[in-house]
Regions:
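Extreme N-terminal starter segment of soluble prokaryotic enzymes
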Residues: 2-9
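Active-site beta-strand/loop signature of hydrolases that rely on acidic residues for catalysis
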Residues: 7, 36-64, 84, 91-92
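Residue-level recognition of beta-strand->loop/alpha-helix junctions
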Residues: 11-13, 50, 121
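Acidic/histidine-rich helix-loop elements
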Residues: 13-26
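Surface-exposed, active-site-proximal loop segments in enzymatic domains
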Residues: 17-20, 57-68, 107-109
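Short catalytic helix/loop segments, enriched in acidic residues and glycine
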Residues: 25-35
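A short, hydrophobic beta-strand-centered structural micro-motif
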Residues: 73-98
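Active-site catalytic loop in hydrolytic enzyme cores
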Residues: 98-148
Length: 148
């Protein structure tokens, strides 16, 4: 049986600044939530963001990680889940976050009911990122209501 699936992809602007991280993070989160609302209103079945959507770039220092990284689960995944539930939309949100007590480049998978149903941890980290982040150990696929 065929089924039409509406997919939205969103890439945030790339920004680099070591002195304006608070502002950049706030602006990126605003763009994330605004873009999701638009995708939801357009009937998107799944919306996918580009890598490290919550920052796009962060100067790699332990101080920055401790101060600016989000936790998974946490306030951002809760808000993403609320939007997913409101529009009955799956969301794949790549975030640089602390999950399970470890700094990871993770893609969070949220289903239509707003629940976090999976996480993929980036396996092959760039050298600079590998100094701080823990790589994933396997390539994963996830089942969604319309396919894998």
């Amino acid at each position: 049986m065929e089924r039409r699936v509406v997919i939205s992809t969103i890439q945030l602007p790339w920004r680099r600044s070591s002195s304006e991280l608070e502002r950049i993070k706030a602006e990126n989160l605003g763009l994330i939530f605004e873009s999701l609302e638009e995708a939801g209103k357009r009937g998107s079945d799944v919306t996918v963001f580009g890598e490290i959507a919550n920052f796009v770039h962060i100067p790699w220092t332990k101080e920055n990680f401790n101060r600016y990284l989000d936790t998974v689960p946490g306030p951002i995944t809760e808000r993403l889940g609320n939007i997913a539930q409101r529009y009955s939309m799956n969301i794949i949100a790549p975030l640089f976050a602390i999950t399970g007590g470890k700094i990871r480049n993770t893609a969070v998978i949220i289903d239509r009911s707003g629940e976090v149903v999976g996480q993929y941890f980036k396996v092959h980290l760039p050298l600079e990122e590998a100094k701080w982040a823990v790589p994933g150990e396997e390539i994963l696929t996830f089942d969604m209501d319309f396919g894998r």
